[in-house]
Amino acid sequence: MNPVTKWLLISLLALLPVSLAAAVELKLTFPQNRTVFQTNERIDVSVVRSSEAGGLPAGVLTLTLAGETSTMTFTFELKGAAAVDGEGSATDHLHLNGWLIKPGTYTLTATMGGASDKADIDIFSHIRKSSYRVIRWEGPRGDDMRGEGEDGLGFNLYGGGTEEMSIREKMDITGWCAMGSSGVFVHQYDSNLDCDWSDPYVYLGAIQRGMDTGLSFRTMPNAVGVHLIYEPGLTWNVHPYLQRANGEPDSSPHDIPSQRRAYESAFDKEQPWANDVDIQTPEGLAAWTRINEFKLGYLDAFWKASRDAVERIKPGALALTGSMYGWNALYDGYYFNNARSLPVIAGHGSFGHNSGTKNMNPSFVLEFSLPRQKDKPTWYRPGWAWYTAEQLRLEQYMSFITGIQGLAQPMASTTSGLSETVQEINQVASRLGTIFVKPAYTKQAVAVLYSKSDTYRHHAGKARHALTLDEVYLATRLMQCPITAVVEEDVLDGTLAGHRAVIVAGVEYLDPAVVDALADFAAGSGVVIVSDDVTVDIPGATKLGMEARAYSEAVIGPAIAGIRDGQAQHAKWIEMDTFTERVEYVRPLAKRLGEVLAEKKILPPFRTNVDTIAAGYQVRGEIEYILAVNFTIGSQPKPSQYTGFMEPGPAAATITLPDNGRPVYDALVGKEMKLDKDKNGLRADLEFAGGDMKVFARPARPIGGVLVASPVVRVDLTREGQPPIQMDLAATLVDKDNNVISGTAPLQIVVKDPAGNVRYDLFRATDLGVCSLTLPLAANDTGGTWTVEVTDLLAGTKGEASFEFKPLTRARSLAGATHRAVFFGDDKANIYRFFRDQRNVTIAVGDSDYNRAAAERLVKILKPYNITAEIVLAKTVPARELTDEEAHTWCGTVAAGAKSGVRPGRENSPAVVGWELPHPVIVLGTPEDNVMLSLMKERRVLPYTPDATFPGRGNGMVAWNLHTLGHDVHALVCIAYDAAGMSQAVGTLFELGVGLDPLLPLALPSSATIEVAK
């Protein structure tokens, strides 16, 4: 190079805003802190450029996503960046459209000038193999999830770890006990009896903890909701007046201070004290009923508030709890409405097989917790643990036959000796459970009444009625009689009319209105069967002709009455309280009930020579499903702590089905059954393993086949948050004359690409005979002729169709760059809602000078939109001041009332009680200069973790939050590490707040090409 040329080059470089000669390092980072993604999300990719010797030049970045059969290439024009303190730094926020990328392993490479970086990523489908929920609750975290998912043990919903391994395992997630302390199951918050769920100081604190936990994994694409807490119940505490026989204060669920406060707020008068209410008078009983029916709203109110918060995390987020175990604990707040406000009814059995009806207890609790909530999904975990394969089958299948929408297993493990049984049950539930996905519970011919008024009539005494229901339920199992549990509201509002008979047992009092309604039912076409121990006169009722007393009352009680030694008494109880003894005790009751029902021409769905075969009966349109579960008693279980449970054993049984002209299909095998016919019906000789299940499907007409319509592919790249490329398919179940069988039948749907590779292998079901399904395809899927094969899983018939797919060659919507400040997509609607709802806000700024200038700009920006803002320095905002009353039960993410150290006044840390923020707040700064943002970062509630390179020099970040800074505190966040970045963040916040959207959600790349292998 001659001297003149050299001088000209040096002069030219000096004139440029940044130094092109400086060495530039380029690094790929993933703001979601993972390299495993799903096909239903925007994949965030940040490109960090840096130079230790000057600024950064503008130029073209090439981003390449290379997989096994395709390569996608994008180019972006990146700006230069001037040096600060001699160093150059820039972070550019790019995104890939996961909706348009097929599952697989890819290498992502970024190149600009002579600098490059690459990273391997994995993308998995968000479409689950089965639409039935197969649930793992209390699961481990991280790599310990390996082998638990769809291709392993078979779970597709996970309550436990929320890490990226859940995506690899193809499971949706909810977390576990987000409101619980370290996942502990508690009736009251952190087991503090002072903290009742009727108390807003308590439940708002619980919601704060639940939101902090839920927000920590909200960017996971497989997060479908937040599991909040297990076994919440209204508290019992020392009563100020009630005393035990020895004169000591008694523990009671009545007259809890927060409940009395709420009652007075509602009725403008003091709630009567429990010890002053005389239930022997009509007026006293009416007052007692009014107090306790009002009390039944507390848990429901708590869940309303919880759901309202959780659903703000992301669209469709489910608020979940465990609300079924205490179905008859009226004074603990449990009735049909206790979780009415939640989108899913979820819970577990009452300590499984260790109480009540022993082997039958898990399904008993399930069926009696279902009344009046059958229009929504039910996810149920029958027991807490297991010890044999037979026990696990029995609990799971007895619950499955009720027609619930999700079946949860206890602490399963790939290393468990029962892993094969777990997998077997999950496979059955995945294949066949699709017929139950749409809640459509069958109203059984026989109903069993659970009486609320009988419990209220006993005040604080023990009602016999609930215990008697144990024996009635077991009797119906022994007589192959499926039942529907009903409550008094079902009797009063006419719901009972959907049944042919109702059994009333063990009651000593019924509300007169209920008696009248039962009499009307009996006067019509209904049958009211009353056991002889019922002391209520119901006109028109049919006397059973025998008592239905609880086994504990009729047998165990008298046997131990003369034993004075407590340990000896307990030992005798354990000796007598076994499932074997209960079955023998209940058999006469089952026989008599069966005789009475037969007299009324109410027959079971099948007959059998082995009475320990339980029956399930579900009707879905023109298809009847008859389910049989073997609970024949085998040997005594191990370990011995599960007292009274008897291990299920094998059975050879003859089952006779009605000869009603319908064909019979083995739904577990997928073929028609040829049964022998005799005068009693169609006979099947079957071998059952312990706890085993058989399922017979009986459509109105023989199945002829499956007709598959030609699939239609639709491409619409303008779609946001949904698949831009969709394949619509429909399959119809028909009889041998090609008429639609209008029912719900299980299907297997397999979609293959032109090379024969399986793209989808799914279990779904028809609805009214038709299964309509929309599946996403990707821009880089293989072009050519695709096939769809549909198999009906009842008869094994198949149908097939094909369609043509042409992959995209150019689609800039596959990638894009953030327009201005970074924000998480699901926060957008919440930010807009904040601006529409709030009229007064506080702006809490960090210590850096640029925050104050940005805040003043924000005050000016907000004023025309009727929002008045006040600026405060975040570090000067004190902790919330608590009164004595508040401090006693104040709860939060790290607090549970005075017993946890919460004190009156301002002595508490803001991390415990929140800040004194009378208005919603907009927080400006960084975690390093703003104490509020520091707490948010510590609790991991921000969608992205801010640091020196994120959002990066000159960039800002905007986020939304609820509850972290205090009870019900709504917050918006602007984070930036310099003035330019904060200016950008405030501007973006303004745009989001007033609804000023760019024409396209992302800035498109300069070019985009897609190469797909032939």
Regions found by a protein language model. Give the residues of each.
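Carbohydrate-binding surfaces of carbohydrate-active enzymes
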Residues: Q32-E41, V47-V48, P57-A58, K102-A110, ...
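Edge beta-strands of extracellular beta-sandwich domains
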Residues: S116-I123, L707, P711, D761-F763, ...
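An acidic-aromatic substrate-binding cleft motif
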Residues: K118-D172, A811-R833
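The substrate-binding groove and active-site-proximal loops of carbohydrate-active enzymes
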Residues: Y132-R141, H187-I207, E283-D300, Y325, ...
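Aromatic-lined substrate-binding rim segments of carbohydrate-active enzymes
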Residues: D144-T213, Y298, F302-E311
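Polysaccharide-binding and catalytic clefts of secreted carbohydrate-active enzymes
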Residues: D194-P200, L204, R209-P362, L366
